[in-house]
Amino acid sequence: MPKREDIRKIMVIGSGPIVIGQAAEFDYSGSQACKALREEGYEVVLVNSNPATIMTDPEMADRVYIEPLDAEIVAKIIERETPDALLPTLGGQTALNLAVQLTEMGVLDKYGVELIGAKFEAIKKAEDRELFKEAMRKIGLDVPKSDVAHDVSEALAIADEIGYPVVVRPAFTLGGTGGGIAYNREELREIAERGIKMSMINQVLIEEGVLGWKEFELEVMRDLADNVVIICSIENFDPMGVHTGDSITVAPAQTLTDVEYQYLRDAAIKIIREIGVETGGSNIQFAVHPENGRVVAIEMNPRVSRSSALASKATGFPIAKIAAKLAVGYTLDEIPNDITKETPASFEPTIDYVVVKIPRFAFDKFPTANQVLGSQMKSVGEVMAVGRTFEEALQKAIRSLEIGRYGLGCDGKDKEVTMEEIRERLRYPNASRVFYIRYALQKGMSVNEIYELTKIDPWFIDKIKNLVEFEEQLKQIAERMSIEEVPKEILKKAKELGYSDRQLAVIFNTTEREVRRVRKGKGLRVVYKMVDTCAAEFEAKTPYYYSTYEDENEALRSERKKVMILGAGPNRIGQGIEFDYCCVHAVFSLKDEGYETIMVNCNPETVSTDYDTSDRLYFEPITHEDVMNIYENEQPEGVIVQFGGQTPLNIARELEDSGARILGTSVDSIDIAEDRERFAELLERLNIPQPENGIAHSLEEAKEIARKIGFPVLVRPSYVLGGRAMEIVYDEETLERYITEALEVSPEKPILIDKFLEDAIEVEVDALCDGEEVVIGGIMEHIEEAGVHSGDSACVLPPVSLDEVTINTIVDYTRKLALALNVVGLINIQYAVKDGKVYVLEANPRASRTVPFVSKATGIPLAKIAAKLMMGKKLRELGVKEKLKLKHVAVKEAVFPFIKLPGVDPVLGPEMKSTGEVMGIDYDFGLAYYKAELAAGMKLPLKGTVFISVRRKDKNDRLLYLARKFKELGFRIIATDGTRDFLVQNGIEADLILKISQGRPNILDAIVNGQVDLIINTPSGKRGRTEGYMIRRAAVDYGVAHITTLAGAMAAVRAIEAVKSRKMVVKSIQEYHEES
């Protein structure tokens, strides 16, 4: 059936900020869908609150609304736009839940908007645990024994009947939020209470724990004519009990017999029909009992998901794009396969390689989080690798993670471990379990014993055993001969099993460079194979490659002039989707200039790894060895390392030493900015102030510096991204503890000590430079005071409290620095303003995480311009104009993962903790800030009770101003004794509430009972389980708005005041840009 002509305007809802469980994959699916719908001539209206996405670019839809994904605000947009249809299946759980709310509020009926892609009933049937269970019974499929509970006593009764352990799964939540595994009544009481609270309909499923069963997923698509295709099967390396987002996964499934696969395939087709997903993709999860083969259906997502992004990248089948076309009435046999151009989408993809996905965790940022993996997702990103064998793909994936490993061990990072530790690490799922399987095999543990401890299928353990045995063989050879003397076939086998040159260098006690030289001398070169959806039965038209060691190279060089762009690797805290955004913009911009673009990246969630973003895509780890192999195969004009965050910069020097040409700002200039001593010299020469500082190599040196410049000081290791291991230190005792710890982690790296400017205002600038001229992209004022990491602070553009003189000084310093560093492309500079004086904190001559936000707020596409400058264009000829004055105000706010990480203190500091960001835009700071907070999931109350408890140094005039404002706005104030005395002495009425240590009912009881609407609690700086910690943690767990800095509270009170007195404006980003 051809496309529908009765609908003209379609609204697409994005997934909002990046959180654990919902990451860049939805930018990828949303962008693909917008492109597909516009290709078909539909008018597209997009709503999403995340400015760091490609989908919110003004070019992606006819009208883009960067507004909170809040039902009332989306209802206003629907009223303004009156779309014919709403497509909610591409924005993750967020969009699905919004579609359900809008339907139930009657908004869709009122404006005659039809849900396409998935009907309301189908969403309900798949997401409501009770309805899903009934549907499975109806079609004769087995499900785990389970029952639905709406309160804790019901949950306990059900579990008693089923027997422990049980899995708790809340309805309508994402990434297992609020869920968990309970082994006894106490644990169940806690998990069920949390789960019921977090579920949109206050419902949890208590399910028989099918722990240790094998877990499989099928990616399925269906059209209106009831054609169903299976795109891909995915097998979880980790058994049931670990959330699939936290499991290592493998595609296609490796350990199913043909009969079992056919059974799952038939079951999946029955399920998608019964649930009634008329069009588009669904992800269906099964558990299979390892001994008796009993199969149970676990759950289904009636939408594009994290797994569908993986399935798309693994097979080359563009699920999101095709889902969008199916939603408007096409059938699968009418849509051509984009990669081959001659087969229709109704051909099921076949693959002749193995794909391995490994999650990336952020436990280094959250040392107090529980690191055992369970049914609630904890990873923040993932990598994918492709190889001809499981062993090769596994080692490449480990190398892609950027956790300092170059494969499965023998890379100079192995630890001495006891059998005791090994058993512990095998029994409890954790991020490094795969390394411990290797240790266990090396110590002689049998495959069967490892299986008993881990329930990981013996097939996988056998493959790891192959690596262990081969490594042993290599080590024996290395005792007898040098790498030069090793027979070629042994080296070839090592490369076929995925060993990196770095690993071989460790085994043969030589350097990576030497291994590379010998390998090439023996004629061992990598070849590239194509991902073409059809095992090479048809010719692929859009090339997408992976490396392996075979004979025939399928990536033949073209004659065009070409540029290579290095991506950002896996998402993690400190380096997220913002950098992918910059890479994609660079690709678009260079295509305009007539270059062939070559993208190198290993993150399956992103737009940069979409088969039709760049001209050629290499799905490879971003390491010196892998990048140089591609460079030699393609021989481009040069490589761009400015856009992928720290990842490409870490290998830039090595690439240059190996003969690659780095485009844009030179490696040496980057080094000046990163190297504290060289940078300080430069600032002195330019006569630009910076905070007093020193560099310590030992504890004694550190104490001496601190005495000289005076506490408080900011201490940190050199060369970091996202402020790893930074701390503000107020006394010598804390300094001693910090330095000792830091020297243990990296003894050879010096430690930087800066005078910490308390209460300074931080300001951040993104600018463009072509070596001769500088154009300021945007000046942002941070809302949180200095000491909160710039990635975690909210910021506002244009600045609201800086005077002309300060702004002119900042502009002047920015120009001087960019020219002195010979920047070609982008530079980001961070300043602190204190008592009217401007200090430079740091400069990064690369794309920063604020580039997308600034581009969205001003309408100047910074990354696109920067890419042209690197290719030799000048700002003058491109006609780029500064827009420092805007009619509107944009606020960027950070989004945090605390809800998914119990035990972590939700307090802001110099170490970055946020996973994503949102933007609020309006004509007034208060309204823009309110929208940003709402978009980040914090709905500021307009009435009710405010609890205030602050540390000693915050008991000042600002606090009094704040409290008076809250009183004027009609709030009741409650406070603990110290803060209350201070308020009352200054004539502000406040009621006393007990501290936790003073008895009951205390502040915790009030939070749990829902008697507090807003919490303002500034931390005392002590570590550990303080009362403040317990209050802040309760705020997160019970969903109460909470603020941990006075500056944040000042902004919040302005926002509340603004919303009570003025109306919020709802306008598309295109309209804002036209006005400025």
Swiss-Prot record:
Mn(2+) 4 binds at E842, N844. Mn(2+) 2 binds at E299, N301. Residues 556-939 are annotated as: Carbamoyl phosphate synthetic domain. The keyword S-adenosyl-L-methionine does not apply. Gene3D superfamilies: 3.40.50.20, ATP-grasp fold, B domain (3.30.470.20), Carbamoyl-phosphate synthetase, large subunit oligomerisation domain (1.10.1030.10), Methylglyoxal synthase-like domain (3.40.50.1380). GO terms for biological process: 'de novo' UMP biosynthetic process; glutamine metabolic process; L-arginine biosynthetic process. One of its GO terms (molecular function) is carbamoyl-phosphate synthase (glutamine-hydrolyzing) activity. Mn(2+) 1 binds at Q285, E299. Residues 940-1076 are annotated as: Allosteric domain. The large subunit is composed of 2 ATP-grasp domains that are involved in binding the 2 ATP molecules needed for carbamoyl phosphate synthesis. The N-terminal ATP-grasp domain (referred to as the carboxyphosphate synthetic component) catalyzes the ATP-dependent phosphorylation of hydrogencarbonate to carboxyphosphate and the subsequent nucleophilic attack by ammonia to form a carbamate intermediate. Composed of two chains; the small (or glutamine) chain promotes the hydrolysis of glutamine to ammonia, which is used by the large (or ammonia) chain to synthesize carbamoyl phosphate. Tetramer of heterodimers (alpha,beta)4. PANTHER family: CARBAMOYL-PHOSPHATE SYNTHASE [AMMONIA], MITOCHONDRIAL, CARBAMOYLTRANSFERASE FAMILY MEMBER. This is Carbamoyl phosphate synthase large chain. It comes from Archaeoglobus fulgidus (strain ATCC 49558 / DSM 4304 / JCM 9628 / NBRC 100126 / VC-16).
